[in-house]
Regions:
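An acidic/histidine-cluster motif and surrounding catalytic segment
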Residues: 1-113, 117-151
Length: 151
């Protein structure tokens, strides 16, 4: 049967953007399949306003240049992938800072996801048992800097 059919008999649930103003999804501009899979996985929900942000590509990074006198990596664990991921998240952060809403009120939350994020059975369960709605309610009452939704 598979998860594909779990939605057949259900109305679209409004996710209310996970309590955020907007969702930014990091994805390579040439990752057409991954973007389509992301869109398909989340298409079963309403209230999911997202925008793809082109990821920094590993092939555009010169790690030796990064490791120059500006960076010290004692463990030698810096890779192009790790650095590209960092730069991609930094790119989204800059995009958030440019949002007019954020410039007026820096307490407005935004969500950053990667294109492999998918609804999990735990999310579905929390929606149907009311826990998700409770989390959104609590988030709206408090001032917070980071809330980690997944693993």
């Amino acid at each position: 049967m598979g998860n594909k059919h779990i939605w057949d008999n259900h109305l679209k649930v409004n996710l209310h953007n996970f309590g955020c103003k907007k969702i930014f999804v990091i994805s390579r501009d040439d990752a057409t399949r991954r973007r389509k899979d992301f869109e398909s996985a989340w298409s079963h929900f309403d209230g999911f306003d997202y925008e793809f942000v082109d990821a920094v590509k590993t092939e555009d990074i010169n790690v030796d240049e990064v490791k120059s006198d500006k960076f010290y990596d004692a463990a030698g664990s810096l890779s192009k992938t790790i650095y590209a991921t960092f730069l991609s998240h930094q790119k989204v952060y800059k995009k958030i800072c440019e949002q007019p809403e954020f410039q007026k009120d820096q307490s407005i939350p935004f969500l950053v996801m990667e294109d492999d994020a998918r609804p999990t059975p735990a999310l579905i369960d929390s929606i149907y048992d009311g826990e998700y709605k409770g989390i959104l309610k609590k988030l709206s009452k408090y001032s917070w800097n980071v809330f980690f939704w997944g693993r």
